[in-house]
């Protein structure tokens, strides 16, 4: 039997509507973990529909790390000013700024990586595989696998979240879209590191 307390607990854990929580619990036979999974699956579908909506509101979040050693600015957009003031949205923006400071991505998504950069990386990875003595017929598969690791390093959305490495940033974003109920877009960011690109004068 599904109780009101179970529905309330599931709602608190997921942010989903009461009726959605009740239906998920019924479909899961009262299993809380399974109900959460069902809501996430259904939430992902909702998030995909919301992704086509225009997100022109939002905030520019800043984060300074390590006694002024690293600074980040990130613009995150949503659909309404109401959500831009929402505490959960603002915390999400802080988490993303901290992620950028810690993981040093170069691009928001893999779609932003220039084709010439991808081709250059493929050439390097192919040569590495050949130098390791890998058979020619499996080199392309090895290159594709290592290219995925490259995207995980340089693309913010592909990176494992520093607070929960089992989840990628794109999964966190999708979860927030489903929970908050609006399209959310990580538009752009800038990361500064003290002394970056400056050659220190050699001491005499």
Swiss-Prot record:
Protein family: Belongs to the EF-Ts family.
Protein name per UniProt: Elongation factor Ts
Transmembrane segments: none
HAMAP family, alphabetized: EF_Ts
Compartment(s) of residence: Cytoplasm
Pfam families: EF_TS (PF00889)
Function: Associates with the EF-Tu.GDP complex and induces the exchange of GDP to GTP. It remains bound to the aminoacyl-tRNA.EF-Tu.GTP complex up to the GTP hydrolysis stage on the ribosome.
Record PANTHER family: ELONGATION FACTOR TS, ELONGATION FACTOR TS, MITOCHONDRIAL
Stretches the record annotates as Involved in Mg(2+) ion dislocation from EF-Tu: 80-83
NCBIfam families according to UniProt: tsf
GO molecular function, one term: translation elongation factor activity
Record keywords: Cytoplasm, Elongation factor, Protein biosynthesis
One GO location term (cellular component): cytoplasm
């Amino acid at each position: 039997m599904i109780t009101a307390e179970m529905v309330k607990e599931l709602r608190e854990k997921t942010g989903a509507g009461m009726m959605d929580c009740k239906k998920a619990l019924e479909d899961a036979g009262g299993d809380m973990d399974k109900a959460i999974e069902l809501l996430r699956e259904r939430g992902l579908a909702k998030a995909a529909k919301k992704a086509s909506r225009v997100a022109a509101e939002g905030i520019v979040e800043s984060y300074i790390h390590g006694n002024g050693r690293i600074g980040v600015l990130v613009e995150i957009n949503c659909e309404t000013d109401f959500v831009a003031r929402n505490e959960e949205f603002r915390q999400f923006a802080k988490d993303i700024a901290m992620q950028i400071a810690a993981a040093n991505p170069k691009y928001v998504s893999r779609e932003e990586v220039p084709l010439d950069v991808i081709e250059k990386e493929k050439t390097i990875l192919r040569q590495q595989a050949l130098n390791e003595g890998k058979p020619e017929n499996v080199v392309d598969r090895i290159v594709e696998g290592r290219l995925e690791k490259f995207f995980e390093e340089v693309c913010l959305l592909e990176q494992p979240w520093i607070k929960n490495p089992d989840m990628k940033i794109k999964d966190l974003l999708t979860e927030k879209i489903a929970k908050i109920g609006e399209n959310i877009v990580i538009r752009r960011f800038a990361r500064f590191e003290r002394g970056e690109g400056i050659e220190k004068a050699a001491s005499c």
